Amino acid sequence: MSNNTYNLPTLSNEGGLAAYLAQIKKFPMLDAEEEYMLAKNWQTTGNVKSAEKLVTSHLRLVAKIAMGYKGYGLPLNEMISEGNVGLMQAVKKFEPEKGFRLATYAMWWIKASIQEYILRSWSLVKIGTTTAQKKLFFNLKKLKNQIAPRAEGDLRDEHVKDIANKLDVSEQEVVSMNRRLSGKEQS
């Protein structure tokens, strides 16, 4: 790489999250036309500077999405780092001629990277790996808060049925995952 590349911000334990967030705010947001031109340039010529500008202009999006996963008890800096990997994948595969903005496309790659990190980080004993179990893992807390915001511990039968129906999983899977996530699982 040449010397005229961006000085990309790093997220370290020493600098802290606040310093990183201050750094990424310095990168300008792109308007639709500039984003399109940079993406086409990256796609057709492989111009790394164009790709870097696309990445740096979307680092705030990664941080915002990662903060939505704070409830899983994992280090935020690691979730942001994983989200950044997803952002880079999105830039690599982005097709600007389809008419969507990069943020719309990248959001799915960022979320997928963060969710995969969370799944890798949680013990396989704690969670499952089937599609239904992943759906349950990532949606149970949100649905519980919607249905019974003040409920602690085990769910009432009607809440279990409601969640099972909404997520298309068995009632036993809901009860089991709820116990796993609340730390009440019995071996």
How would you name each of these model-derived features?
Residues 146-186:
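Long, charge-dense, solvent-exposed interaction surfaces that engage phosphate-rich ligands
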Residues 2-127, 131, 135-149, 162:
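Alpha-helical promoter-recognition and RNA polymerase-docking modules of transcription initiation factors
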